[in-house]
C-alpha cells in the first residue's frame, strides 16, 4: 500500500478511476496556482478559513438554541420563534439525544424568543426570561460581541473559572488541575516590594530539583581543533537566557548569557571589576 | 494490506485519563453512495433556498401576505437542520468528556468534517479552559499530512465549535487490538509517519505530551493522523515544563516523578512505548497496580522478545532510556538505520538552508490573506527583518513556508502514483538522506553538546563556568537574604511561589518599562542549592489580540539598544560602558549583519537588554556577597 495522501477525494468519488484521476488532476492544478491561493491543501480539504465565525453576513454570528427534555417526556416536534425577525418564522429544531437544538445567525444585541412544543407555546424556565409590553412572558437572550471571538470568549471563561481564581491567588485553598505556564501566571500578579514572611517561606514546598539540561554549560564544551574557535555547539532551547558565571578572580566578575537571534544564537560575555 | 472493518468514527474526547473517557460509539448506517449523494444535493439546495427566503424576509419590514406567509411557513417546516458556518451538522460520531463530536458536511463542496462541540459552561466547570485554548492555539496553524487538521473554530455564546479533519479509519489502538503485533514493515511505516509529525511539532516549538495509540487516528488509506493537542504546550526559550500529564503507561520517568523537563524528550519516550506496542502488541511497562507500574517505568527495564531484531532492540533501549540526557533525540531516531529503511521522501523534506535568508513573496502575500491578521505586506516583511523571530507574523510566515515544502513533496508523490511512473522501490542503492548529509556537514562546522573530549592540559588552564550562584544555607534563609538584597537595591518583584520570583528595577517613571528577570532557586543535592538568574524579554506592545495568548507564551530575544520597534533592519553596536568590556561571540559568521557596526540611533544609545540584565545580576550578586 503506497503512502497516498489523497484520501479525501478518493473517498468522495469512490470506485470510478477516471473520476479519481480527474479529482487528482484538479487538485494538482489547484496546487500549482499562484494567484488567489490561500494555502496548499495536501489532502484536498476545504480551504483554510481563518476567522472567528463572522461569515458572509455582515456582523451576524451563530447562536445555539436548545430545548432539553427527559427520557420520559420526549416531545415529538419543537419549533422556535423569536424577535430577530419580528416573530415571523417558526424554525423547526433538530432532535438529538437529550434535546432539540438549532443554530440561528444573529447580530449582537438583545432578543426574545419562545418555543412551540408539540403545538403548545412554552417558555423554558432554565433560560433567561422577560415580559414584553403586552405582559406576555418570553425567553430572553443578550448576545455580546466577545462571545464570537474565540480567544476572547475563552479568556473570559478562564478568568471566571476555578483555575483563573487560583492563579490570581484569590482562593489558594482550592486545588486546580489546569496548570498553565509560569508566564501566564506572571501576567496575573503585580509587582511589590513586600518581603514574604519567614513563616511563609518555611511552609512552602522545597525548591525543585535542578534539571540536568541546565548543568550542560555551553562555554565548558571543548571545541575540536578543526572548528572555528568562535563557534560554539548549538544550544537547546532551555539553555537560553540563563546567566552563567566564572568565579571572581583578580577582582573581576565574568558573566555570560546566550540568546536567540534570528535563526542563530549569540553568546555575550561581560567582564566587570568589583 | 489488512482489510479491517470500516467504521465511520472519529476519536473520542479524552479527559486526560483512561478512567474518565466515555466510550459511546455511533455508527453511520450503510447506504448506497448514490442515494447519499442525492440526499446531500437536496439538502444543499434546500439550504440555499432557505437562506434566500430568510434574506428577503429580513430585508422587508412589511407584513407578508397571508398566502405568502403560509407558503413561507410550509417551506420552513421541511428544513429541520443545524448549520454552523458553512457546515451542516449530521449524525453524532461520539460523546466525549467535554462534548459531542458530530459529522459536518460542507454545504457547497459536500466535504466531510468532524465538528467537536464544546459546551462553554461545562469546560469552565471542569476547569479545562486553558487546555482547550492551548489546543486551538497550537493546532490552528499546523499543516502536516500526519497531523489532524483544525480548519476553523467558531465561538457562540454557549458553545465552541472546532471544525476538524474527518478521519474514518478509527484509532491505531483498535487496529493493534484487532491485529495483534504488526509485521515489521507495517510497524515501521506507521512509526515513520508518527515521528515525522512529532518532528514537525517540535520544529514549531510545540510539545504534544499525550502521544499514545488512542490519540493516533487512521484514515482510509491507513495513514496515521496525530490528534488531541489538549495537553500540548508551547516550548519557550529558557523555560522548563513541569505538569505531570498524559497517560501513565506512556509517560516518561521524569514526568511521573513530577520533575522539570524540556519537552521533546518526553515525546521521544512516548514514541518508544508506541513503537514497542506496534511491534509486540503489548506495552513495555504495564501493571494494574499503579505504584508497581511507576516502579517499572522508573527502572526502565522492559522485556525484549526474541522475535525483535537487534537494530530494533537497540533503538528501543535508546528511546526508553531513563536518563533524559542519554535518551535518543528525534534526530537520533531519524538517523537510525532501521528507521531509514523504506523511508518516503515526503516525510522529511530537505531544508534548503541557502534559501533561509530569502523572503518568499508568495508566503508573505498568503500571511496577509489571513482574515485574522489585517495587515499589509510591508508589515509582514518588516516583521521578518526585525529582531523578533517570535513575532506572530513571522510565526505564520514560517509555518506557511514549511507547509509549502511538505505540500510540494506530497504533490510529487501524488503525481508519481497517478502516472505510476515508478513502481514500488526495489532493493536499489541506498541514497543518503538529506537530513543525514546536512547532519554530517554541520558536525564538521559546529561541535555538538555531546562532545566531552578534553585534554588534561587545557582543563587545568581553563576556568569552569557555572550556572547562577550556589549556597549551602537553608532554602528559606537564602530566599530571605535575596528579598532583603533586592529591597536594598530598590528593586520590585512578583512572587509566583516563594522560590520563583520575577524581578526588575523600580521604574523611574510610569511609562518606563525596565527589563525583567526571573530568579528561581533549585536544589542541586541534599545540602546544596543554586540561585538561577534568567533574562525575560519585553513583551511587544500592541500585538494583535487574537495572537496575544500565543505571543505572551513566547520568549523573545534581546532587542538592540535604543530601538524597540520591529521595523528596523539594523542592529547598532552596544555602547561600551566605562570600566566594563563586552565581548561578543557569534556562533556563525555567515550572517554578516552581526559584524556591521552602524552608528547609534539619534536618540542616544541605551544599554542592550543583555547588558542591562548583566548589570542587575552583578548588582544583586555583589550585594549578596557582602
UniProtKB/Swiss-Prot annotation, chain B:
Official protein name in the record: 5'-AMP-activated protein kinase catalytic subunit alpha-2
Regulation: Activated by phosphorylation.
Pfam families assigned to the protein according to its UniProt record, in alphabetical order: AdenylateSensor, AMPK_alpha_AID, Pkinase
UniProt GO cellular component terms: axon; cytoplasm; neuronal cell body; nucleotide-activated protein kinase complex; nucleus
Coiled-coil residue windows: none
Disulfide bonds: none
Tagged with keyword Lipid biosynthesis: no
UniProt note on tissues of expression: Expressed in the pharynx, the ventral cord, neurons including the hermaphrodite-specific neuron, body wall muscles, the vulva, the excretory canal, and weakly in the intestine.
Membership in a protein family: Belongs to the protein kinase superfamily. CAMK Ser/Thr protein kinase family. SNF1 subfamily.
Binding site for ATP: 93-101, 116
Biased composition (Polar residues): 58-77
Signal peptide: none
Species of origin: Caenorhabditis elegans
Function description: Acts as a sensor that couples lifespan to information about energy levels and insulin-like signals. Role in motility and response to oxidative stress. Involved in the establishment of germline stem cell (GSC) quiescence during dauer development. Plays a role in axon regrowth after axotomy in PLM neurons. Plays a role in the maintenance of glycogen stores which are necessary for resistance to hyperosmotic stress. Plays a role in the regulation of flp-7 secretion from ASI neurons.
Documented EC number(s): 2.7.11.1
Disordered: region residues: 1-77, 541-568
Catalysed reactions, semicolon-separated: L-seryl-[protein] + ATP = O-phospho-L-seryl-[protein] + ADP + H(+); L-threonyl-[protein] + ATP = O-phospho-L-threonyl-[protein] + ADP + H(+)
Origin superkingdom: Eukaryota
Bias (Basic residues) ranges: 38-49
Modified residues (Phosphothreonine): 243
UniProt enzyme class: transferase
The gene coding this protein: aak-2
Amino acid at each position: 500500500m503506497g503512502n497516498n495522501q489523497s484520501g479525501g477525494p478518493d473517498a468522495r468519488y469512490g470506485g470510478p478511476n477516471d473520476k479519481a484521476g480527474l479529482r487528482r488532476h484538479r487538485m494538482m492544478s489547484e496546487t500549482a496556482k499562484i494567484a488567489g491561493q490561500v494555502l496548499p491543501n495536501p489532502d484536498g480539504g476545504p480551504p483554510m478559513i481563518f476567522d472567528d465565525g463572522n461569515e458572509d453576513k455582515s456582523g451576524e454570528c451563530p447562536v445555539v438554541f436548545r430545548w432539553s427534555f427527559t427520557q420520559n417526556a420526549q416531545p415529538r416536534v419543537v419549533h422556535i420563534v423569536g424577535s430577530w425577525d419580528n416573530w415571523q418564522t417558526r424554525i423547526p429544531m433538530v432532535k438529538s439525544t437529550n434535546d432539540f437544538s438549532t443554530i440561528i445567525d444573529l447580530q449582537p444585541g438583545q432578543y426574545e424568543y419562545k418555543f412551540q412544543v408539540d403545538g403548545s407555546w412554552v417558555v423554558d424556565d432554565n433560560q433567561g426570561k422577560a415580559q414584553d409590553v403586552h405582559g406576555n412572558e418570553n425567553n430572553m437572550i443578550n448576545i455580546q460581541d466577545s462571545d464570537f471571538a474565540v480567544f476572547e470568549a475563552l479568556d473570559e471563561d478562564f478568568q471566571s473559572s476555578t483555575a483563573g481564581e487560583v492563579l490570581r491567588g484569590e482562593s489558594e485553598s482550592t486545588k486546580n488541575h489546569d496548570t498553565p505556564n509560569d508566564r501566564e501566571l506572571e501576567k496575573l500578579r503585580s509587582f511589590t516590594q513586600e518581603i514574604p514572611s519567614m513563616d511563609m517561606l518555611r511552609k512552602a514546598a522545597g525548591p525543585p530539583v535542578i534539571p540536568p539540561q541546565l548543568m550542560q554549560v555551553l562555554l565548558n564544551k571543548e571545541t575540536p581543533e578543526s572548528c572555528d574557535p568562535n563557534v560554539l555547539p548549538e544550544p537547546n532551547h532551555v539553555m537560553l537566557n540563563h546567566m552563567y558565571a566564572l568565579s571572581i578572580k583578580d577582582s573581576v566578575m565574568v558573566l555570560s548569557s546566550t540568546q536567540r537571534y534570528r535563526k542563530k544564537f549569540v553568546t555575550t560575555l561581560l567582564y566587570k571589576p568589583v | 494490506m489488512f482489510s479491517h472493518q470500516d467504521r465511520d468514527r472519529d476519536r473520542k474526547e479524552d479527559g486526560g485519563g483512561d478512567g474518565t473517557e466515555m466510550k459511546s460509539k455511533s455508527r453511520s448506517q450503510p447506504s448506497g453512495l448514490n442515494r447519499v449523494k442525492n440526499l446531500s444535493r437536496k439538502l444543499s439546495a434546500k439550504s440555499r433556498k432557505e437562506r434566500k427566503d430568510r434574506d428577503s424576509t429580513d430585508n422587508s419590514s412589511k407584513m407578508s401576505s397571508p398566502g405568502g406567509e403560509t407558503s413561507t411557513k410550509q417551506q420552513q417546516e421541511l428544513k429541520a437542520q443545524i448549520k454552523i458556518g458553512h457546515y451542516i451538522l449530521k449524525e453524532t460520531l461520539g460523546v466525549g468528556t467535554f462534548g459531542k463530536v458530530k459529522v459536518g458536511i460542507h454545504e457547497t463542496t459536500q466535504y466531510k468534517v468532524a465538528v467537536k462541540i464544546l459546551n462553554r459552561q461545562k469546560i469552565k466547570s471542569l476547569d479545562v479552559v486553558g487546555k482547550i485554548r492551548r489546543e486551538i492555539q497550537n493546532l490552528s496553524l499546523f499543516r502536516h499530512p500526519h497531523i489532524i487538521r483544525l480548519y476553523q473554530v467558531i465561538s457562540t455564546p454557549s458553545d465552541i465549535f472546532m471544525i476538524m479533519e474527518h478521519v474514518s479509519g478509527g484509532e491505531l489502538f483498535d487496529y493493534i487490538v484487532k491485529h495483534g503485533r504488526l509485521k515489521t514493515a507495517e510497524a515501521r511505516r506507521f512509526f515513520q509517519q508518527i515521528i515525522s509529525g512529532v518532528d514537525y511539532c517540535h520544529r514549531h516549538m510545540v510539545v504534544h505530551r499525550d502521544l499514545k495509540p488512542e490519540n493516533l487516528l487512521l484514515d482510509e488509506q491507513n495513514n496515521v493522523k496525530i490528534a488531541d493537542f489538549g495537553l500540548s504546550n508551547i516550548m519557550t526559550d529558557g523555560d522548563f515544563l513541569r505538569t505531570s500529564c498524559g497517560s501513565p503507561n506512556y509517560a516518561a520517568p521524569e514526568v511521573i516523578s513530577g520533575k522539570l523537563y524540556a519537552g521533546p524528550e518526553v515525546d521521544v519516550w512516548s514514541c518508544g512505548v508506541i513503537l514497542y506496542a506496534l511491534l509486540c502488541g503489548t506495552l513495555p511497562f504495564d501493571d494494574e497496580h499503579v505504584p508497581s507500574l511507576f516502579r517499572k517505568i522508573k527502572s526502565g527495564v522492559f522485556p525484549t522478545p526474541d522475535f525483535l531484531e537487534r537494530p530494533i532492540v537497540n533503538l528501543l533501549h535508546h528511546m526508553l532510556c531513563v536518563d533524559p540526557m542519554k535518551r535518543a533525540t528525534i534526530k537520533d531516531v531519524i538517523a537510525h538505520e532501521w528507521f531509514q529503511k523504506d523511508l518516503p521522501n515526503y516525510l522529511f523534506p530537505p531544508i534548503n538552508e541557502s534559501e533561509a535568508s530569502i523572503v518568499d513573496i508568495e508566503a508573505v502575500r498568503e500571511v496577509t490573506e489571513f482574515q485574522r491578521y489585517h495587515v499589509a505586506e510591508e508589515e509582514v516583511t518588516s516583521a521578518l527583518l526585525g529582531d523578533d523571530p517570535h513575532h506572530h507574523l513571522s510565526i505564520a510566515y514560517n509555518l506557511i513556508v514549511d507547509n509549502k515544502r511538505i505540500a510540494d513533496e506530497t504533490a510529487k508523490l501524488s503525481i508519481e502514483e497517478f502516472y505510476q511512473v515508478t513502481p514500488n522501490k526495489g532493493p536499489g542503492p541506498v541514497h543518503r538522506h538529506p537530513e543525514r548529509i546536512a547532519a554530517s556537514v554541520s558536525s564538521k562546522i559546529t561541535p555538538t553538546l555531546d562532545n566531552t573530549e578534553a585534554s588534561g592540559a587545557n582543563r587545568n588552564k581553563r576556568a569552569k563556568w557555572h550556572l547562577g550562584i550556589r549556597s549551602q544555607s537553608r532554602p528559606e534563609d537564602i530566599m530571605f537574604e535575596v528579598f532583603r538584597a533586592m529591597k536594598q537595591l530598590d528593586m520590585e518583584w512578583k512572587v509566583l511561589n516563594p522560590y520563583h520570583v520575577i524581578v526588575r528595577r523600580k521604574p523611574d517613571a510610569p511609562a518606563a518599562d525596565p527589563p525583567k528577570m526571573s530568579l528561581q532557586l533549585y536544589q542541586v543535592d541534599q545540602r546544596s542549592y543554586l540561585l538561577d538568574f534568567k533574562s525575560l524579554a519585553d513583551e511587544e506592545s500592541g500585538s494583535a489580540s487574537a495572537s496575544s495568548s500565543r505571543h505572551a507564551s513566547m520568549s523573545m530575544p534581546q532587542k538592540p539598544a535604543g530601538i524597540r520597534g520591529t521595523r528596523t533592519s539594523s542592529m547598532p553596536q552596544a555602547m561600551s560602558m566605562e570600566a566594563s568590556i563586552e565581548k561578543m561571540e557569534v556562533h556563525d559568521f555567515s550572517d554578516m549583519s552581526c559584524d556591521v557596526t552602524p552608528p547609534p540611533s539619534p536618540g542616544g544609545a541605551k544599554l542592550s537588554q543583555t547588558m542591562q540584565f548583566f548589570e542587575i545580576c552583578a548588582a544583586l550578586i555583589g550585594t549578596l556577597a557582602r
